[in-house]
Amino acid sequence: MCSTIVNDLDDYCASLNSSFSKSLYCASHDGRHLRRPLLASSLYSKPFIRATEKLELPSISQVHTRGPADIPWYNPHAAERPLLPGDKLPALSLPTATQGLSRTAYPDPSVTNSTNSSARTSLSSASVPVNEPRSPPSSADLSGTQGRLSLDSSAPTEYSLPPSVNEGYYPSPTSLGSMNQTQPYMDVHSHMSSAQSYAPQGATAGAMSQYQYHGQPPVMQPASSYAPAAYPQYGYPTGVTSPPTGHPPSSMGGQMPAQLLPLPGKLQSQNVIEDYSDRYQVSNHAVAPPSGYGNSTGAPLQGFVFDGTGQVAPPGAKPRVTATLWEDEGSLCYQVEAKGVCVARREDNHMINGTKLLNVAGMTRGRRDGILKSEKLRHVVKIGPMHLKGVWIPFERALEFANKEKITDLLYPLFVHNIGGLLYHPANQTRTNMVVQESQQRRLEGPPPGPQRTPSGSQQGPIHHHHPSLQTPMSSHMSQGPMNGQPGSRPGLERANTFPTPPASASSMMNQGSSYEWGGQVPHTQPLSIDTTLSNQRSMPTTPATTPPGNNMQGLPAYQGQGYDSSKPYYSAAPQTHAQYAPHTPLTQSGMSSYGQPLAGGYMKSEMAPPNPRPGVSEPETSERDSNRYSQSNGPGETVAEHDQEYMQDHNAGYNSNRGSYTYTTNPSVSSLTGEHSQLTPEMTSSPSQQNGSGRMTPRTGAGPPPHWASGYNTPPRPAATTLYNAVSDTRGTPANGASDPYSMASTTAPVYPTGNGSLSAGSKRMREDDDIRAESTAEYETSKRRKTITDATLGGPVGGPPILQPMKPSGVMARHR
């Protein structure tokens, strides 16, 4: 096959006047490379032929890679060597002093026609690979010497270590030429005393260093680029020239296996490696464990004497220690990672996390826990970072366990007495000292008071929860205790006092871009809504940076005028709705929160327990108060003849629209209440009434006096919410402040006067009872209440509709008595 190829090449290569290209082609063909790339490489390298005459080395490397199967091909070509001089490639006599390689010509008996008697060259001295571009060796050398040398297992050991082998020149023809290369290579190295097969050893980055001239000029690369294609399995990342360290062991290792990294005891070639160590970062150690630790497998390395004290670093091990400050314990912790497990050792008492230590040994959980439980002296840590949790045992016991499980070398330098000296590496000595000093200082000072440390942890959690809302324009949500209803907000005010709310001092941070960005996002016009009560009662210590503004926050009162969040479109737009609320500046800040903030339903305060079925109990509020609530919707004292009219006036229309969606059966009654509630503290109203875009209170919110509302709540949903509202408002409105009844809350829907509604009637009855309970409820009032009918609407009772809810009395008097 080769011969036919050569014949084909004759015409093509005639211009080349050398069998060099032919031999290349054959080699390339053997290497399963395309002819064109090889020729290109040979041509490409030609210009350098005259430039330098150091090309012989590459031929040697390729020789090694060649497999015995290639011998027949090369031998015939060896005869053609004489042509090479025409190529101006001097015979092997060319070794240049600069190469630093002394070549000894070894007559090669296998080649009879070799003009180059020095088929083999021994590299007497390890020399750093020359970076100068090397022209390809003469074809005679290439074909003849390579073939003989690579195939000759008896080749002197020198071949195994050609320091400046440029595979790049002929990667495809020779180095990659045969898959068998490793086998001949092993033969070549067989004289080496290492028993291990070289292929595995080649895996080490160091092994490849000699052959891989990552420092080589790009000249080699063109040829090398072809090589990878030929043998993808080698997976040369960048071709032969790529840095040795980067190559997976398999890449070059298959071709030039272990020669580079002698076994620990076999250092024949180590001098070469050392020479290259600077360039290739090959460790001077005979063995360079890939992991950087002497023993990543748990089995002692060859030539490594197990050290039970943990003071001696295993071969090739690099101390990897990190230190962190364990705030909870006030101690510095040294951490060493082994097998993906972080084992920590305290600096103060040198106790070691036995749980993690035994995890490194791969011990089962049951056995591990049993061993640790039997320890007399132990410290159990159940909170904190995962790598610090577990059972801490004394240093001596930990060392015993490590020795018993044979993981002491894996854990190096965990047991080194002066582990602090290894911390971070001398380059960072200053930082190391700083860390150690800080830990010592803290230990001397004693652990910081809990509050100082915890604020960042416990305190921040809640704060962060608020933050989403804080960052939103709704400043009211930000801090108000009432906000509890909101999903992330803190609990109700009653609990807020004990909650880790931000310290009052934090208020100074308001406008600063504190970590929470309190001030920046809250409109200043609307002071942060954090209740002053909260700020005053902060349970947490003052932690300026992280805590939300506290006392500085202007009281919610400022909000009252503004309809909770002016920023909220529906709030600002709804001021009228809010008007019901806002007008009651009397509302406590919390009260405001109930309006401005759409309190989440969850927010309901315990106080907000559903309105008592017996509305009368809390109802004792004066009718005036009721009037205020109602008056909000329509001006106080202003009677609304029609439900619809009231709604329209109140901007309730929006409310009504929301009402439609409102399914609160109790809401109908509640809505009227909402007006009242403006006075109520949000805790009272903490219902999510805000859910209505209008900002109306939800039934509970509205249910300021739970009793009245309770009737509404308890009663089954009224078929017509409006009726409920009417009934409620009627009840409300009729009380002494009937005029204030502007309880416009009555739904805009035409009052359905389901006098027949049992549920409505029941609700109305409750309402009546509530009214009776009212201090103001006089006999006349009650009678008027019962007498209320649709006609009452003219009186301007809240929407007049409410009376409809009232069951018609047999004596039903059409006119309402005011």
Swiss-Prot record:
InterPro entries, sorted: EFG1/Phd1/StuA (IPR029790), HTH_APSES_sf (IPR036887), KilA/APSES_HTH (IPR018004), Tscrpt_reg_HTH_APSES-type (IPR003163)
Pfam families linked to this entry: KilA-N
Feature: DNA-binding region: 354-375
Gene Ontology cellular-component annotations: nucleus
Residue ranges occupied by any HTH APSES-type domain in the UniProt entry: 320-426
GO molecular function, one term: DNA-binding transcription factor activity
Region entry Nuclear localization domain, spans: 765-788
Coiled coil, from the record: none
Result of knocking out the encoding gene: Blocks conidiation and causes aberrant hyphal morphology. Decreases expression of developmental regulators brlA and abaA.
Start-end of Basic and acidic residues biased regions: 640-649, 766-777
One of the GO biological process terms: sporulation resulting in formation of a cellular spore
Biased composition (Polar residues): 137-157, 469-487, 504-515, 523-540, 586-596, 654-695, 723-734, 745-762
Subcellular localization: Nucleus
UniProt KW keywords: Conidiation, DNA-binding, Nucleus, Sporulation, Transcription, Transcription regulation
Biased composition (Low complexity): 110-128
Disordered: annotated segments: 100-164, 437-571, 583-818
Function, in words: Transcription factor that regulates asexual reproduction. Binds the StuA-response elements (StRE) with the consensus sequence 5'-(A/T)CGCG(T/A)N(A/C)-3' at the promoters of target genes. Controls the expression of the penicillin gene cluster.
Family: Belongs to the EFG1/PHD1/stuA family.
Protein name: Cell pattern formation-associated protein stuA
Source species of the chain: Penicillium rubens (strain ATCC 28089 / DSM 1075 / NRRL 1951 / Wisconsin 54-1255)
Gene: stuA
